[in-house]
C-alpha cells in the first residue's frame, strides 16, 4: 500500500505573533493568513521487512531503523519521528514497517511555515494509511502538540491550522487553547488582484524563528508594555485587513502591512536585518517616473 499527501505552505498576512502563548492565552489572538501553491509532500509505502526507512529530502536526512514502537529523537528526521511516536502511543499500535519520503517546495526557515506544514502533511499520510478518525481541527491540534510539546519547538498555532484547512482564513486563538477557523469567501477578482499586487521575495537566507518567538514570549511574560501594545495593534491589523480584503481595497491592504511591519519590529530583536529592510524600503518607497 502506498499513501501520498501534500499540504500547502502559508503567507501570514496579518496578526502574526498573536497566536503565540502566553499572549494568546491572556489577550486572545487574531490571524489572517492564506495558503499558496507551494507544498510539503509525504509518501508512505508499507513494507514487510521489519525496517523503517526515512528519506527526508527536505532536511537532507536518509536513515534506516529497525521497526520499533518508539524512535529516538536525536536531531535526525525529528518531525517524522515525532509524528510516528505520537500516533503509535495515542492509538496503542504495534510497531510499523514502512518507507517514508518527504520533500518541501521551500527551504526551512523561509517564513512560510515549512516545519508545521510538514508535520500536518506527515500526519495526513498516517491518518489515511491507518484509517485514523481525525478531522481538520483534530489534525491541527495534534500537529501543534507534536511540534510544540513533544519536540519542544517554539512557535505559534496558525501554521498547523493553515496547512490543514487551506485557503484564506481568519483565525481566532482564545484562552484554554480554543481555536476557531473562519474561512473567508473571497471573490475571484479580489484574489486575482491580490496575486497581481504581490511579490513573494526570497532573501536567500533561512533562519530559525525560535529565538525571536522566545523573546516575544519573554516580553509578554515580563509585562513589557512597548511590546504588548505593539502586539495589540498587530492583532487589530487582522481585523482591519479582513475588511480591506473582502472589499478588494488593495491600497488599504498595503497600508496595513506597512503599519504592522513597524509594530512587528518592536516585538523582538532580530525581526529584521539590513537585507530585509532594504527590500522592504525598495517596494515601499521606490516610485517609477514616466516621461511626460
Please tell me what each predicted stretch does.
Residues 15-17, 114:
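Glycine-rich beta-strand-to-loop/alpha-helix junction loops that act as flexible
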Residues 84-108, 142:
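Glycine- and acidic-rich phosphate- and metal-coordinating loops
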Residues 1-12, 19-25, 31-33, 37-89, ...:
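C-terminal nucleotide
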Amino acid at each position: 500500500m502506498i499513501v501520498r499527501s501534500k499540504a500547502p505552505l502559508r503567507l501570514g498576512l496579518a496578526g502574526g505573533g498573536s497566536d503565540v502563548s502566553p499572549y494568546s492565552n491572556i489577550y486572545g489572538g487574531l490571524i489572517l493568513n492564506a495558503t499558496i501553491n507551494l507544498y510539503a509532500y509525504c509518501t508512505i509505502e508499507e513494507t514487510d521487512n521489519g525496517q523503517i526507512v526515512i528519506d527526508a529530502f527536505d532536511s537532507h536526512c536518509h536513515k534506516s531503523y529497525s521497526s520499533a514502537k518508539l524512535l529516538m529523537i536525536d536531531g535526525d528526521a525529528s518531525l517524522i519521528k515525532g509524528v510516528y511516536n505520537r500516533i503509535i502511543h495515542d492509538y496503542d499500535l504495534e510497531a510499523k514497517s514502512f518507507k517514508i519520503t518527504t520533500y518541501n517546495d521551500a527551504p526551512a526557515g523561509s517564513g512560510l511555515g515549512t516545519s508545521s506544514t510538514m508535520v500536518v502533511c506527515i500526519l495526513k499520510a498516517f491518518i489515511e494509511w491507518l484509517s485514523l478518525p481525525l478531522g481538520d481541527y483534530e489534525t491541527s491540534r495534534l500537529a501543534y502538540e507534536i511540534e510544540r510539546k513533544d519536540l519542544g519547538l517554539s512557535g505559534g498555532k496558525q501554521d498547523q491550522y493553515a496547512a490543514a484547512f487551506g485557503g484564506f482564513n481568519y483565525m481566532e486563538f482564545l484562552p484554554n487553547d480554543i481555536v476557531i477557523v473562519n474561512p473567508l469567501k473571497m471573490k475571484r477578482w479580489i484574489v486575482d488582484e491580490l496575486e497581481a499586487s504581490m511579490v513573494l521575495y526570497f532573501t536567500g537566507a533561512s533562519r530559525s524563528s525560535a529565538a525571536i518567538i522566545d523573546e516575544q514570549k519573554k516580553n509578554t511574560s515580563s509585562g513589557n508594555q512597548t511590546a504588548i501594545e505593539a502586539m495589540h495593534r498587530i492583532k487589530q491589523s487582522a481585523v482591519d485587513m479582513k475588511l480591506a480584503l473582502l472589499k478588494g481595497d488593495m491600497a488599504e491592504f498595503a497600508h496595513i502591512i506597512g503599519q504592522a511591519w513597524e509594530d512587528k519590529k518592536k516585538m523582538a530583536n532580530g525581526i529584521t536585518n539590513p537585507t530585509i529592510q532594504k527590500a522592504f524600503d525598495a517596494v515601499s518607497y521606490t516610485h517609477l517616473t514616466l516621461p511626460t
